[in-house]
């Protein structure tokens, strides 16, 4: 039996939009009017490498049993009973409502595993709604935008904990794969980069490296409190801004220290806010102090950003204090590639937030990295490259049998993610995966962002069949 996931919540929080997103096409009717969905609807769904059945439900409402609303509620409760996992959805834009609290209790009484989903986080002013969701006692909320596909990787990870599925078991094709991080376009098979959409940029770094000074310099006003004392910024502050006609949402964050040094309760909350800002962001500018770069905490922050799948850019701040600048920049960029190989080619820009030096170049790097982060490689060129790469450097033999690579497809962007069909994926050495990742970077210009490759076993069409005699 397929793993079943029910999407529930009060009316008009975006359940049907998420249903359509998971199914991969517009099946459920979506409208701003509450109560559009009346019956529960079941369909097979795919989220990256996870396959399951998803159930769309009517909005939970208080109503007498004989009424239409009461019968709709009964359908929803039946869906919860049938499901293996409940996605309890709230509207982060509207904030927590009394009905959310009441229906959270209904779901809790059912005793089913629950993932709390905070929807509509792609608009300004939703951070408070996400934080309010903790009060429901259903665990940490997963922030998503069902309409725009944001947060789908995090949702996949949350579902996978309960589904027990980590590897894709069937052939994934571009036509079947749910669109991640891009709008569903019913008229187009190929998602394209949209330069009119806002870019969410978080500015992170150790305490007192100049994050708030940098944002003030970028927007040209004293919007954020700055000073020589470490830790002035206590929470994640967002600033809406335009640069060369492009809408940008900037997040300043609290300085991120090593865990052992995070003692004060308020500072722990501040670091938690910084982590959430990273997850909300698309591009993350990591501010290094150029006078003492590559501290252990700098590298830990950079590694976290890459693991979260964000698009990193390094700003070497306080460049006005550096002597022998050309030699120093070459040295820092060489160190960047050596110490952060998981995002080889990462863009780094020398700046001075105090004097304004290098700020345009920093924003140019952020926008170009965002384009690469959204890059999609067509299947034809991808597999021609794979054939050439595996011919030039075949996979090794393991236990006397040579491994074979068969086919590759890109299953997501933001960051680029690929599935490689091969024989015996469990035996494929990491060194060969790194070879393929480096080849993808070189051949398709995917420098400076994480690249993820998942392996799946290729199908043997003769498996289980008796060999025919000639």
From Swiss-Prot:
Subunit structure: Associates with the 50S ribosomal subunit.
Biological process per Gene Ontology, one example term: ribosome biogenesis
Coiled coil: none
Family: Belongs to the TRAFAC class TrmE-Era-EngA-EngB-Septin-like GTPase superfamily. EngA (Der) GTPase family.
Domain EngA-type G: 3-167, 199-374
Organism of this sequence: Chelativorans sp. (strain BNC1)
Annotated GTP 2 binding sites: 205-212, 252-256, 317-320
UniProt keyword Repeat, yes or no: yes
HAMAP family on file: GTPase_Der
Annotated positions binding GTP 1: 9-16, 56-60, 119-122
Location of the KH-like domain: 375-459
Assigned keywords, A-Z: GTP-binding, Nucleotide-binding, Repeat, Ribosome biogenesis
Name of this chain's protein: GTPase Der
Role, per record: GTPase that plays an essential role in the late steps of ribosome biogenesis.
SUPFAM superfamilies, per the entry: P-loop containing nucleoside triphosphate hydrolases
GO molecular function terms noted in the UniProt entry: GTP binding
